[in-house]
Amino acid sequence: MINLNIKEILKKIDWQDPMWQKIKEEILDLNQRIEDSKEIEALLDGFNGYYIPAGPSGLITRGRDDVLPTGRNFYSLDPYRVPTKSAYEIGKRLAEKLIEKHLNEQKCYPENVAIFWMASDIMWADGEGMAQIMHLIGVKPAWFGNGRIKDFEIIPLKELGRPRIDVTIRVSGIIRDNFPNCIELIDEAIQKVASLDEPLEKNFIKKHTLEIMNKNKGDFRAGTIRIYCSMPGTYQAGTQLAVYASAWKEEKDLAKVFLYWNGYAYGKDIWGEAKHKEFAEILKSVDVTYNKVVSDEYDLFGCCCYFGTHGGMTAAARHLSKKEVKAYYGDTRDPENVEVRDLADEIRRVVRTKLLNPKWIKSMKKHGYKGAGDISERIGRVYGWEATTQEVDDWIFDEIAKTFVMNEENKQFFKENNPWALEEITRRLLEAWERGLWNPAEDIKKALRKVYLEIEGWLEDNIGEVKSEFQGGSIDVITVEEVEYWKKKMQEVVKI
């Protein structure tokens, strides 16, 4: 039902005005569709094998009110309609904002931007990121009259007004498996741009293609591979597994894991072929790594894939290039005011607005065991970003320790609802300190040690006799060199 306060406001409006009459109709229509949402009923119907009516999916915060009523069997979108014309305009602005930021800070154009291309870009944002990729390399979509993509067109250098920026794309497994046409379109565009008769200082795609060709006996196709993912049938970037297992000592260890897991090429005539050497070569030319946020409903702490892929790619590019590689984050939450900021600034923004926000913490505590576990997972991802990129400020770890470990009220909440979550939080903080990723004050160090011993006592007192398998926590540092199976599997990657 419509909120009572809103009803009172509506009573004061002159509904005889035609403009307000139309708005009223829209409000009442939205309210009716919200009331018609039957999610639980649809779930039960599905369990019983009944028909569930179909409906579109999307973010209502992006104006997609057609997703109402919910509880329908939702479908995605026509993959041959992305990027849409409106998304292309947003993508163009994103590309120019990224280039402008790098020019202002580094006094030069970025030659190669490594992009984590997520399915949310296509399914929620109609291909803004895809459009950004196209504009960076200097091409634009060509549409049929019905809005479907016909092909791409080359933007002349004179019209573009700058060099063509190279891209290295780690595409998500969902895009790979559900939107192969989008991958093939970008791949064809990259090959076309690499073959243009243009000066190398104006076409970084061509420049890097020739460099790779010189190391691959003149193989043009090897030189133009820019889209990579994990092995067919697999997902995730691998880096997060190494981080969570503490299976690394230095940045190079995470770089090797990322390279091994993600060195499989995808494109028009190549699908899932192992191309680790070519992947390593193109990563050497990366100047910037990049991802973007499209909605506050999801952020870079929402899944380990964010730091595993974007963070892993940053670690790999820095290790292989032996140079400073910037990490940027785009923001299209407000499509009218797109931004590109440092990854460190995006981390600060999300930490302040969610993780350390008292209102957010209060709302999570309402969910008891699950809420405690979710807090622990997000803190683990903060650690993951620091492990892979070193872009997390010390004050963030300080405040996490003070808020969740040293605060008596919150500590009691974890003790009563999920002491394992507090054990994980404390252990990750201790690991960050021991690895030199964070330099806490002495009082914080002392408190962490004390609380960790308390947690061990809680768990020993309450866990009882364990007769089956049991997973405990520890900080054991194990790398590929120490596990014979891993060592054998990654032998070729280690040589790169």
Where in this protein do the model-derived segments appear?
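Ligand/cofactor-recognition surfaces for anionic moieties
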Residues: 1-496
